[in-house]
């Protein structure tokens, strides 16, 4: 494994551990010791997707899990994962899961709640 691949694996692990807070590419690059542009190029090269897309998709998967497994309000879930507003969260969630968060919850909510 090359040093660049190791760096990306370390960054992915750090991102996954910090998805509950706002993550800006600039901050991740600073944490990694790379420029924003260089880190984005490396990430795309080794992961086959953009850094921003990776973060957004991971946050959406966690939000979907929370919708299925909790009774928390959609607004609280959207804030937890750093979305700018509930409207933005709903638009991105709907584009990804083909239904708004409320409908997704109704259809997929765990039977234990």
UniProtKB/Swiss-Prot annotation:
Alphabetized PROSITE patterns for the sequence: HTH_ARAC_FAMILY_2
DNA-binding region, residues: 26-47, 74-97
Pfam families: HTH_18
Residue ranges occupied by any HTH araC/xylS-type domain in the UniProt entry: 9-107
SMART domains: HTH_ARAC
GO MF annotations in UniProt: DNA-binding transcription factor activity; sequence-specific DNA binding
Superkingdom in the source lineage: Bacteria
Cysteines paired by S-S bonds: none
InterPro entries with a match to the protein in the record: Homeodomain-like_sf, HTH_AraC, MarA-like, Tscrpt_reg_AraC-type_HTH
This protein's UniProt keywords: Activator, DNA-binding, Transcription, Transcription regulation
Described function: Probable transcriptional activator.
PANTHER family xref list: REGULATORY PROTEIN SOXS (PTHR47504:SF2), RIGHT ORIGIN-BINDING PROTEIN (PTHR47504)
Protein name: Transcriptional activator RamA
Recorded name of the encoding gene: ramA
């Amino acid at each position: 494994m090359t040093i660049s691949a190791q760096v990306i694996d370390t960054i992915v692990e750090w991102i996954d551990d910090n998805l509950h807070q706002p993550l800006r590419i600039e901050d991740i690059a600073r944490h990694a010791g790379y420029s924003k542009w260089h880190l984005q190029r490396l990430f795309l090269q080794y992961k086959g997707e953009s850094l921003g897309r990776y973060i957004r998709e991971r946050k959406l998967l966690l939000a979907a899990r929370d919708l299925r497994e909790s009774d928390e309000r959609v607004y609280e879930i959207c804030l937890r994962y750093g979305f700018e507003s509930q409207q933005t969260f709903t638009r991105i969630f709907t584009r990804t899961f083909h239904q708004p968060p409320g409908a997704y919850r109704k259809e997929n909510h765990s039977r234990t709640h």
